[in-house]
Regions:
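N-terminal export signals
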Residues: 2-4, 10-29
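Short, cationic motifs built from Arg/Lys/His that form the positively charged side of catalytic pockets
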Residues: 8-9, 241
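Mature catalytic domains of secreted/periplasmic carbohydrate-active enzymes
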Residues: 16, 31-468
Length: 468
C-alpha cells in the first residue's frame, strides 16, 4: 500500500470575502489575440514548435531553489495561515506594514543557491494572500507602498542575475485579498474585473524585470481555463517573454508538469517540488528537517527519471534563511561540487527499477551509480563468495558492457566483473569514499539501462528454480 499526502495546493477550500484592493478593470483591455493559431485548448503553434529549445537549459539544470516569502513569514505558521486559521482580511493586511526584510536578503538567497549547486530560483511574487512583492500600479497592497517600501522582486532579480542564476516567478492565480477573488465564479462582472487584474499583474511582472526564464502558476481555483481565458493568458506570456517556460497550473498543460511532495515521472518535462521540513512558508516551531542524504536521494531519483528537483526554503520575516536549511543546502552543494557531472545534463531512463542501496543516472554511455547506503560488512560474506572481497557494489540487469569504472570523489579506478546477470564492483574500501552518497561512474559500450526484471528469464540457466 502506498500513501500520498494531500497537497495544500490541491486541497483548496472556499476563500472568504476580500477587503478592497485597487483593481484596474481596463488593465488588459489593450491585449490582442497575439497568436490565433490554436490547435486545441492550451496548445498553439509557437509554444509547441519552440518547446524543446526553450526547455533545453532547464532540463540540463536539474536543481532549483523555491522560495516562499510573504506576510505569512511574519506569523511563522506556514503560508496558509490566513485561511487555515480564519484570520479576517482587515486584520491580516495589517501585517504588510511589518514586513521589513534586511537590505541584503536577496543577495544571501542567491549566494546560498549558488553554493548549493542550484541553477535557478523561483520566488513567490504573490502567494494566495494576495500581497504583491513588487512595485505594482494595480493595487496598493504591495511591498513598494507598504512595509519595506522597496521592490523586493527587483532585488531578487538583480541578486539572481549577479550570481548567474536563472529567474523564475511564482504567481498564485487564487487571491484571498482581492474583493472579486471570492465571487468571481458566480458573478460575471466580478470575474471580468478579476481576470483583467490578473492579466495586468502578469504583464507587469513580465515587462518590468528584463528576461524571465520561468513562470510558475499556482492554484487556478475557482475558475476553469475558459473562465480564466487561459489560452490568451499564455499567449500574452509568450508575446512578452518568447523564451520563457510555463508550468501546468493555470489549467493548461504548459511546458512542464509539477508533482508536489512526490516524485512522479511524466511522459513529458516535469519537476518535483519539495520542502526541507513540513511546510513551505516559515514555521517557527517546525524543526523536522529531512537529512541531506534523503534530499540528495530525491535529487538523484528525479534525475534518474528525467525530471528536475525544486527544493524550497522558507525564510524568516527579515529574510534570513533558517540555519538548518543553510546547512542542508551547503552540504548538498559540497556534494555537487564533486559529483555534479552525475546530475547536471543527465538524461532520464538510466533505470526502470531501483536498487537496494543505490540509484542510477546516465549521460551518454556513462552510468552513474549513486550508493546512498554503503554495502560493507555484510555477515553474508562469510558464506557467499558473491560478497567477497569485503565490499561489493552489485548491479543486476545492466544492458551494457562496462569498459571501466571509477569513484567520482577520488578518481580511484574500481575493479569489476560482469556477466549476463550482474555487474560486481569489487576491491572497494570498508568505509564509503564519499558522504552522504558515493558515486561510481561506469563507462559503457552503449547507453546504459538498469532493469532488474531482465534477470528473471536468465535464472534457469543458473539452475535456479529447476527441479532437483
Amino acid at each position: 500500500m502506498t500513501f500520498e499526502p494531500i497537497s495544500r495546493r490541491s486541497f483548496v477550500k472556499f476563500a472568504g470575502a476580500g477587503a478592497l484592493a485597487t483593481a484596474a478593470p481596463g488593465a488588459f483591455a489593450q491585449e490582442t489575440d497575439a497568436n490565433p493559431s490554436v490547435t486545441k485548448r492550451g496548445k498553439f503553434a509557437y509554444q509547441e514548435e519552440t518547446r524543446a529549445r526553450r526547455l533545453a537549459w532547464w532540463e540540463a539544470a536539474r536543481f532549483g531553489m523555491f522560495i516562499h516569502y510573504g506576510l505569512y513569514s511574519i506569523i511563522g505558521q506556514q503560508e496558509w495561515a490566513m485561511e487555515s486559521e480564519g484570520i479576517p482580511i482587515p486584520q491580516y493586511q495589517l501585517l504588510a506594514e511589518h514586513l521589513k526584510p534586511k537590505p541584503d536578503f536577496a543577495r544571501e538567497w542567491a549566494r546560498l543557491a549558488k553554493r548549493a549547486g542550484q541553477k535557478y530560483m523561483v520566488l513567490t511574487t504573490k502567494h494566495h494572500e494576495g500581497f504583491c512583492l513588487w512595485d505594482t500600479k494595480l493595487t496598493n497592497y504591495n511591498a513598494m507602498q507598504q512595509g519595506p517600501k522597496r521592490d523586493l522582486v527587483r532585488e531578487f532579480v538583480d541578486a539572481a542575475r549577479a550570481e548567474g542564476l536563472r529567474i523564475g516567478f511564482y504567481y498564485s492565480l487564487m487571491d484571498w485579498h482581492h474583493p472579486d477573488g471570492a465571487i468571481c465564479k458566480t458573478d460575471l462582472e466580478a470575474r471580468k474585473r478579476f481576470v483583467a487584474y490578473t492579466f495586468g499583474l502578469l504583464r507587469e511582472l513580465l515587462t518590468n524585470y528584463g528576461k524571465i526564464d520561468i513562470l510558475w502558476y499556482d492554484v487556478d481555483w475557482p475558475l476553469t481555463p475558459e473562465e480564466w481565458d487561459a489560452d490568451r493568458m499564455n499567449r500574452m506570456v509568450f508575446e512578452l517573454q518568447p523564451d520563457i517556460i510555463v508550468n501546468n497550473r493555470n489549467g493548461l498543460d504548459g511546458d512542464f508538469s509539477t508533482p508536489e511532495h512526490k516524485i512522479k515521472a511524466a511522459h513529458r518535462a516535469w519537476e518535483s517540488c519539495e520542502t526541507m521540513n513540513l511546510g513551505w512558508g516559515y514555521q517557527r516551531a517546525d524543526h523536522e528537517f529531512k537529512s541531506p542524504r534523503i534530499l540528495l536521494n530525491d535529487l538523484t531519483t528525479c534525475a534518474q527519471q528525467g525530471g528536475n528537483f525544486l527544493l524550497n526554503i522558507g525564510p524568516e520575516p527579515d529574510g534570513t534563511v533558517p540555519p538548518e536549511e543553510v546547512s542542508i543546502l551547503e552540504t548538498m552543494g559540497r556534494w555537487l561540487d564533486t559529483n555534479g557531472e552525475a546530475i547536471y545534463g543527465t538524461q532520464g531512463g538510466a533505470s526502470i527499477s531501483f536498487g537496494n542501496y543505490d540509484n542510477f543516472t546516465r549521460k551518454g554511455n556513462t552510468l552513474y551509480i549513486h550508493v546512498y547506503f554503503w554495502p560493507s560488512g555484510t555477515p553474508a560474506a562469510q558464506w557467499l563468495k558473491f560478497f567477497r572481497p569485503p565490499t561489493v557494489v552489485a548491479v543486476g540487469g545492466l544492458n551494457a558492457k562496462v569498459l571501466s569504472a571509477r569513484v567520482l570523489k577520488t578518481g580511484q579506478r574500481v575493479e569489476f566483473t560482469q556477466d549476463e546477470i550482474s555487474l560486481r564492483l569489487t576491491g572497494l574500501p570498508e568505509q564509503a569514499p564519499d558522504e552522504p552518497i558515493t558515486v561510481i561512474a561506469c563507462e559503457c559500450d552503449r547507453p546504459p539501462v538498469v532493469n532488474h526484471h531482465r534477470i528473471r528469464p536468465l535464472w534457469p540457466r543458473y539452475g535456479v528454480g529447476m527441479p532437483g
